[in-house]
């Protein structure tokens, strides 16, 4: 082992001394992709490491004892100058095997004043010991073992007194402040919780893993004048034995995991819905200033409808899950998680729950609806049936994300089935295209940090996409039957993926839904091919239009190289249709392929376009031979465009952008295909285009091709913007309004005169005459007024932010204030972000700071100057200094800027301030360097198209007939993208890369040694 370390260290030293040439930088997944994403998204940092040879994690609790019941008293001192919580927990537990002499549970950041183990009334002498590195409390018997009986468990009780200061980091039991109305001078404090994934151990000693389910009886002691809420209905309330307090006792919970508990102590008001007996079944609670202004009405209506719809869909009524359950939706002023599915007490940021018809735009309206749906779906997928461990978190979050869209679509007309394509399928295909992407089922997750990393785009978005693919494989009714059986069989238990697979397979077999796929089709292996291995395939389709023979080669897609060297085969459901008889309605697969090369008979001969993956139900990309691409382009530019499903047009846009980025296709070819956007007016293709163009435009800043590309985008968007116009029309469909909300800011960024002038005029109408800007136009109107204005415009909007009572409007303002380039105004904003002054909330620091950097192209330098002048103040505001610095690194535009930034990082004072974060922060600058170098490899191809325009493609005609595919086929030659030659690095850059190499080498050593 020592010899290996010495050898590697010697190699590393040799690299530094010799300044050996660095291989061309081919990494094209860049830092800013971690920063681009909507609310409630979990954007991967592409830093997950595939784990193998997994051993039991030292962070996992032993299963030698298990709890059955907790009795908890929480004492919440939210009204005191020093805010604390304390209490007592009595855990009923038993041994699961003989010769157990130690009980191991979780406890962290608490003072324990008493730890007593009893069997009945007999005290068992023990020695408690803390093991803080694993958050463990070890209670060792001084003599003998716990009694064990396999047939009749011998019960013990472990009683622990605890106390802790109220947290302020939005984990465990923490404090939050609010004003009933913005001009209220009286700041009010409340206590609330966030336990997922590993923070229940901050609130009380417990078995803080999802697999240790138990029942809970809870009493909350609170100050007089406050109210409390818990997961279940209140059993009773009365004076405490301690003066100035009252105690609320709650009914027993269902059998549940610790991370799903929650409590609130506040002076909130409720908007209730009761049954005939007057019992509250569903309520929304929030600060009185929001409830009294009607901001809870929308969530109350939609929440009840979603709960009823999900109860019907699952065949398992929510209120039948346990007689003590009710549904409370709570708006929390400070809430880092966004929303949380605590069983019966769901918690949300205000912006994700409270709706005001005059001041909440369509974006936040749909967020409120679909986050309600996500959390309500968890009552079944996550709460009733829980992932056995966080390595299969997709069993919880994949289904919640799936129903976030489709459950909402059954209740509200918000275009969510369409938007699933852009927001879930396309987003997860990108995250999953890195060689570092983790599989959905990811053994080896142990530490709290590793658990946190599982809350990723792959887990949420890919999980939901694979579930959708499987639903189309089985059919909706069969899929629902299988899910109902899964929930029924595993209610109040934990689940592994095989439990889901067998339930769905059984339903499929009983209904005959799997017979069409042949006797060799193994449903479990199909599902495992998508959950147990990372990545996804690109299908390379070559069509002989004279014979109808289609040769399909699958390769794992790699965003950096096109085809991954880590090739894998997936079991892929295939659908396709042709121009001979186009049909995009039947999404049931016609073929299942699992081999590297497969031949399929198209069924017709002749020059007909062919499109695979109908409605993009499958989780894969499709690349065609050049001739077939030409036929598709002709169709998209002509009358056949309307025959091709909107989702498939969006699929083509997204695929083509990623093929060009990875080198599977030139940008000249890609833009030829994308030229059909000139005639496109639908939502999904244009949102896919916006995403692709924004990514490319960010990399072309300072390049001559940027202005030419901008002109082309304006040209192509003239038809859709001509139909939409810049102002909403009364009664228009939601998706038209939402497309305008997406496109209008882009038009202003492209300096379209109608947009810039319109924004200025609308803003002045607000500032001078008080006429409100239409809610769906405020994002682009505010931003462009600030870009074109100065201190006057900034002060007007900042005062509006400070005084507004609707949090969704405050967020829109916070997201646009950074558009100012006025230095003093920008510095005012930055100071209020990083100074604890109850002006901007900690949960919004990252949003506000990122907007300050990215809201205006000139701001990167201004914000970096501010950071350098206020280093400690900025670093203190964030959990990690990497957060604010990553925003700077992502927007450096030239090699000179990167080198200047790296030189600053390498100063002794900055390295000392960054500490252990230095390596990651320096690595961010290297990622940006790679981005700059990558652009040089595509400039010629881009320029060729922008200069010459579209290729001329001549249509051809032929007759239709059927033909059988040949019985054998020669595997086609796959053209690999060439590795581009990048500019040589400067000495400074070479030293930087050498340093990064050593950092990476150290990480590898840590893993393998």
Curated annotation (Swiss-Prot):
GO cellular component, one term: extracellular space
Residues given in the record as Zn(2+) binding sites: 374, 378, 397
Classification via InterPro entries: Aminopeptidase_N-like_N, Aminopeptidase_N-like_N_sf, ERAP1-like_C_dom, M1_APN-typ, Peptidase_M1, Peptidase_M1_aminopeptidases, Peptidase_M1_dom, Peptidase_M4/M1_CTD_sf
Organism per entry: Heliothis virescens
Record GO biological process: peptide catabolic process; proteolysis
Active site per the UniProt annotation: 375
The enzyme's E.C. designation: 3.4.11.-
Propeptide feature ranges: 16-52, 988-1009
Purpose: Binds to the B.thuringiensis toxin, CryIA(C).
Annotated family: Belongs to the peptidase M1 family.
Protein known as: Membrane alanyl aminopeptidase
Record's bilayer topology term: Lipid-anchor; GPI-anchor
Gene3D superfamilies, per the entry: 1.25.50.20, 2.60.40.1910, Neutral Protease Domain 2 (1.10.390.10), tricorn interacting facor f3 domain (2.60.40.1730)
